[in-house]
A protein has these predicted regions:
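Accessory interaction regions appended to the cores of large information-processing enzymes
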Residues: 1-264
């Protein structure tokens, strides 16, 4: 490793490594480089490095976020950063119909936020951050308000199964793709995870309806980039990276074991 700002530690499980870097962009560049070199691996959601004080109290890194945003998007930015434990420290008028915001926010509150910020501001917002120091832990953050659509069976996705599934949310796959139990195939429109069978075919009958021959229309799937996939995955999910594909999966693939772990 020639990158002095990158630290790699072997975990107790010899199949996994803990990789520490300078932020999401730094780690995503490493992932993309490894992918291009032919590696296949899985990554978890990025985490910050915590410290403890002399009394054993948990401390976390805090950053100052400087934001310039068109006036009409000020409300949504303040709301989203508030949900991520951000505290508005300053607010003023900037040039050309822009508002300048200054937030104090935990570093983990910014994980996965920049893509969301660009969407919320229609690409017109500017965000810069600087490290402030370590402060007492601010409490849990809910990174995602929408749950996942999870494949229930292993097989190949078919139009009929996907047609039923797309009513539940946004799909990440189209027909003819290999799926396996525990694989995330889309984003739910609601907060909870839903298991779906996208491999199911329509039962054949002797009767025909007037619309029997009409092709089922599927909404084109949302194809996630590496950055979008890293932003999307939740703490109980992994991103599988191969030279040709990106797949999101639950850490625990078995449905029963997954539900059992959630009850603990």
């Amino acid at each position: 490793n020639t990158d002095v700002s990158l630290r790699v530690e072997e975990m107790e499980n010899t199949d996994s490594f803990k990789v520490s870097g300078r932020g999401e962009l730094h780690l995503s560049v490493l992932i993309e480089n490894m992918r291009r070199e032919g590696y296949e691996f899985a990554v978890s959601k990025a985490e910050v490095l915590y410290h403890t004080d002399e009394n054993g109290k948990k401390l976390e890194p805090i950053e100052t976020a400087y934001i310039d945003v068109p006036d009409e998007f000020t409300g949504v930015v303040i709301e989203k950063l508030g949900q991520r434990k951000g505290e508005l420290r300053n607010m003023g008028v900037s040039n050309g119909g822009y508002t300048r915001l200054e937030f104090s926010i935990p570093s983990r509150g910014l994980i996965g936020y920049r893509g969301e910020f660009m969407t919320d501001t229609k690409g017109n917002g500017i965000i810069n951050t600087s490290f402030d120091g370590y402060e007492p832990y601010k409490g849990d953050i809910q990174y995602r308000k929408q749950g996942s659509l999870i494949a229930f069976e292993t097989g190949e996705s078919v139009t009929y199964g996907l047609y039923s599934a797309q009513e539940r949310g946004t799909l990440f796959i189209g027909p003819g793709e290999k799926v396996y139990s525990g694989m995330v195939i889309g984003q739910n429109g609601k907060t909870d995870d839903i298991e779906l069978n996208v491999c199911k075919t329509k039962h054949l009958t002797n009767t025909r309806s007037s619309s029997a021959d009409e092709a089922l229309r599927l909404t084109p799937p949302k194809i996630l980039s590496l950055e979008q996939a890293l932003d999307f995955i939740d703490t109980d999910e992994l991103l599988e990276v191969t030279p040709k594909t990106l797949r999101i999966r639950k850490k625990i693939l078995d449905s029963r074991m997954r539900k059992r772990s959630m009850m603990k």
